[in-house]
């Protein structure tokens, strides 16, 4: 029953004469190993394999349908080879096994079929190549013809040749990959691509400053793979997360392509500070919004820009969502709203692999609002006039006045002839909307050697929104490099450059003359034509303070943003398990916004045309140093200890200028000096925020059953008041892998059962600059002599006691899986309490400032 790859050693050694590297590869394939001693005291096959895994370090790949894991084994084996041990474990079972170092693949032995093996059966020689999904060759893949005692393995380049009976089914199997079966056709070439097999519980999950197996997690962490997301139809990854993880809500808060997205993890807790989660991109913490130049434009309410706009979704490998205090406390004062860790794709060993994809899609407004026709509008206007007359004169049902006693009759705005000849009128909503379009192109190349791996990509994304003139164009490039210099040192660079151009439409939510495009279209009079007899935009006689919706499409408003995000690391494995690492990076964002409201619009006519230009720059720097020690004490005690330091600063600078009263619309925003406003607007700003942090984490694994995590972080920031510059954020967690207990090990249908409990504190540092005293000069005027002078005035009172909001969170979780994780799920219960909420207290009326920021006393 036994079949080993050593049976093919003659062919392999022949190939090994060509060089030392192939020889070493072949040596691995022969599965050389030392003898072992082990005792199986009448236990199940499953328990015996677990003993070999824990005691000798072997890994096994086996299909539960191919073997009887409940069969008993009773043997005491001393100084025996692994082959003998496996034969004893699987005694009287029709299996064979392949041994590669410490990896063992157990498969059902092929059944002999006399019809296929007979001397009269037709046979032919086939050949081919076996690769993984990246196109890289797989070495040592087992290839057999089902029903025939014929088999071979692939060589160093993934090629094979084999003589098999005609019309055979060829089975390709390899440790760590899904077995594939292909039916032999008329040709002699048969290639196969194997898919990597990942056990759900052995999946590696990225956490703060590290990674660990999913089975060892003590916190509430959800992983989202990008293959599960609709890549082709979305500007940013934020749009795609809705419905992909429990406790996550994602709401588009603007019709503007690339506009803001409200992303919340476990709801909103803050009333005065921010509720955005912290984003970590390849180890670099980024802010909650994209840099946005100010706009002196009353119609600029499109929501904050999405911070992930500049990231190509096709570059993302995985997304981890950290929800509870156990998983987020490592980020301290910035983690109260949860953490989203984004990991981009890396290169793989092998020849260059080039991927290209293109997508085209359309967008339509679902449930498009049906607008009144002119005839319907007139009819309803007459009904309203009558209802208003009844109300004003207190006629039933608004009173008991006799209608005949009223002198003033009802005045209807439209007569029957007007209504009959009205027709459909103007559908303003239809005129400002359209069928949207999205198209994009992605090109990537990846590859490398065992020491140097790379991934480079380029993406072009273009979207025309469903509201006319709302456009979004993005170019992104990425380069990820990892280089293992020697056995000790390794470095890597993750860099992405992006350029975004947005055409902004006036989407304000105000009323009357401040109405945005959609508001005005929803309320405008359908009896009014788009243009009057003179060819100018018509203004409704009934709605003199609401702008003509189509005229607002004449507004020019463009934003251009450039971003360069670079993060590099150098790490050294000082001794086995002890790794020191330094991260250094920067995030450089520059934005320019130009806007012009022409005199053809209602507001532009009042202002004589209004132009503005603004610029904004945000430059963030990061320096982090960590030491991670992973070690075992005996085989029962496993430790992972992390200690680190972090410094990050955020440097913001902006400038804007605006003018009005232009003699022509031709120059738009390109000649601010030609405006004749009495007082042009000029503004500038500059700020710097710093964080200095110390953090640590201890993970303790006892018997692979009982998991403990202790985490703490100390954050200091100049954003906090001088009396509260530093905060401490601790957490603790415990997890019990109940499935590993003896009373559940033999329950076959239950593949996982784990209980998690955590308690900890995190902070919300998004309190703005409310802790400090502010003075402003703009518009602070006084008369001295015969001239008007500009002075300064206090606009904000300092509060030296102001600090972060503190969230205390308890979390209980239960993870379960059935039928080898074919069915799995998680139950979570959590309770949050937030204290030191940011609020504002009213001051005495005689003071120059009306309110001061302070901490609310009541927790929520």
What are these regions (language model features)?
Residues 36-41, 72-78, 129-133, 220-243, ...:
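Short, polar/charged loop or turn motifs at beta-strand boundaries
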Residues 49, 53-56, 93, 99-147, ...:
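Short, acidic, small-residue-rich periplasmic hinge/interaction motif at the N-terminus
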Residues 276, 439, 474, 480-489, ...:
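Extracellular/periplasmic, surface-exposed regions of secreted and cell-surface proteins
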Residues 105, 187-193, 237-239, 262-266, ...:
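N-terminal periplasmic accessory domains that precede
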Residues 1-125, 165, 178:
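Cleavable N-terminal targeting peptides that direct proteins into the secretory/outer-membrane pathway or into
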Residues 143, 241, 248, 283, ...:
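Non-catalytic regulatory/gating segments with a bias toward low-complexity or hydrophobic composition
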Residues 148-159:
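Short, acidic Ser/Thr/Gly-rich low-complexity loop/linker segments typical of extracellular
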Residues 223, 244-247, 256-261, 271-278, ...:
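Residues embedded in well-ordered regular secondary structure
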């Amino acid at each position: 029953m036994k079949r080993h790859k050593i049976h093919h050693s003659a062919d392999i050694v022949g190939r090994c004469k060509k060089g030392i590297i192939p020889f070493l590869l072949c040596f691995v394939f022969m599965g050389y190993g030392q003898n072992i001693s082990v005792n199986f005291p009448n236990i199940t096959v499953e328990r015996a394999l677990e003993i070999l895994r824990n005691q000798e370090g072997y890994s096994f790949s086996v299909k539960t349908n191919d073997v009887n894991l409940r069969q008993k084994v009773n043997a005491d084996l001393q100084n025996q080879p692994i082959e003998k041990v496996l034969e004893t474990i699987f005694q009287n079972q029709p299996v064979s096994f392949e041994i590669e170092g410490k990896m063992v693949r157990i498969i059902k032995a092929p059944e002999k079929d006399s019809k296929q093996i007979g001397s009269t059966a037709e046979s032919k020689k086939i050949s081919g190549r076996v690769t993984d999904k990246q196109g890289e060759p797989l070495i040592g893949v087992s290839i057999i013809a089902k029903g025939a005692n014929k088999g071979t393995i692939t060589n160093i380049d993934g090629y094979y040749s084999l003589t098999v009976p005609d019309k055979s089914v060829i089975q390709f199997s390899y440790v760590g990959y899904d077995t594939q079966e292909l039916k032999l056709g008329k040709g002699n070439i048969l290639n196969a691509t194997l898919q990597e097999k990942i056990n759900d519980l052995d999946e590696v999950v990225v956490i703060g400053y590290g990674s660990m197996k999913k089975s060892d997690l003590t916190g509430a962490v959800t992983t989202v793979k990008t293959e599960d997301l609709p890549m082709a139809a979305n500007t940013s990854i934020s749009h795609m997360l809705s419905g992909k993880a429990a406790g996550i809500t994602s709401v588009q808060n603007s019709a503007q392509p690339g506009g803001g997205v409200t992303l919340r993890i476990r709801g909103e807790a803050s009333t005065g500070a921010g509720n955005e989660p912290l984003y970590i991109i390849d180890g670099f913490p980024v802010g909650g919004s994209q840099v946005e130049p100010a706009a002196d434009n009353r119609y600029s309410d499109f929501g904050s820009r999405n911070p992930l706009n500049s990231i190509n979704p096709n570059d993302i490998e995985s997304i981890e969502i950290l929800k509870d205090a156990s998983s987020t406390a490592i980020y301290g004062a910035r983690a109260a709203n949860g953490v989203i860790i984004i990991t981009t794709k890396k290169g793989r060993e092998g020849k260059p692999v080039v991927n290209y994809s293109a997508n085209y899609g359309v967008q339509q407004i679902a449930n498009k609002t049906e607008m009144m026709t002119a005839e319907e509008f007139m009819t309803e206007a007459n009904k309203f006039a009558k209802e208003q007359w009844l109300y004003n004169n207190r006629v039933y049902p608004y009173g008991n006045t006799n209608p005949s006693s009223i002198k003033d009759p009802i005045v209807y705005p439209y007569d029957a002839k007007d209504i009959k000849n009205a027709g459909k009128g103007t559908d303003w909503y239809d005129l400002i909307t359209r069928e949207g379009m999205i198209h994009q192109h992605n090109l990537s190349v990846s590859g490398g050697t065992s020491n140097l791996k790379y991934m480079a990509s380029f993406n072009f994304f273009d979207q025309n929104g469903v509201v006319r003139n709302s456009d979004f164009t993005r170019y992104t490039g990425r380069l990820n490099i990892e280089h293992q210099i020697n056995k000790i040192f390794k470095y890597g660079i993750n860099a992405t450059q992006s350029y975004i151009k947005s055409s902004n439409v006036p989407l304000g939510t105000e009323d009357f003359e401040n109405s945005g495009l959609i508001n005005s279209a929803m309320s405008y009079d359908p009896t009014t034509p788009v243009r009057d007899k003179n060819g100018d935009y018509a203004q409704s006689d009934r709605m003199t303070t609401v702008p003509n919706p189509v005229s607002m499409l004449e507004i020019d408003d463009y934003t251009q943003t450039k971003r360069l995000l670079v993060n590099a690391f150098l790490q050294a494995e000082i001794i086995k398990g002890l790794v020191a690492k330094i991260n250094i990076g920067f995030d450089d964002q520059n934005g320019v916004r130009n806007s012009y409201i022409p005199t053809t619009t209602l507001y532009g006519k009042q202002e004589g045309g209004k132009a503005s230009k603004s610029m904004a720059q945000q430059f963030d720097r990061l320096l982090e140093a960590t030491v991670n020690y992973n070690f075992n004490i005996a085989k029962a005690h496993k430790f992972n200890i992390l200690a680190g330091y972090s410094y990050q600063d955020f440097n913001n600078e902006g400038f804007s200028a605006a003018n009005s009263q232009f003699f022509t619309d031709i120059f738009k925003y390109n000649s601010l000096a030609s405006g004749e406003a009495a007082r042009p607007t000029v503004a500038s700003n500059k700020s710097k925020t710093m964080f200095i942090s110390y953090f640590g984490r201890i993970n303790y694994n006892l018997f692979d059953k009982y998991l403990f995590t202790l985490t703490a972080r100390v954050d200091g920031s100049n954003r906090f008041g001088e009396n509260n510059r530093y905060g401490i954020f601790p957490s603790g967690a415990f997890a019990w892998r109940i499935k590993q207990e003896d009373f559940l090990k033999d329950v076959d249908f239950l593949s996982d059962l784990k209980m998690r409990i955590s308690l900890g504190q995190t902070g919300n540092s998004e309190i703005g600059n409310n802790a400090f005293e502010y003075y402003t000069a703009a518009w602070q005027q006084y008369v001295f002599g015969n001239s008007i002078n500009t002075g300064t005035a206090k606009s904000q009172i300092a509060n030296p006691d102001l600090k972060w909001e503190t969230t205390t969170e308890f979390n209980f979780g239960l993870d379960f899986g059935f039928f080898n994780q074919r069915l799995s799920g998680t139950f979570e219960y959590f309770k949050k309490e937030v204290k030191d909420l940011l609020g504002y207290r009213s001051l005495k009326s005689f003071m120059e400032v009306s309110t001061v920021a302070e901490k609310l006393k009541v927790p929520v």
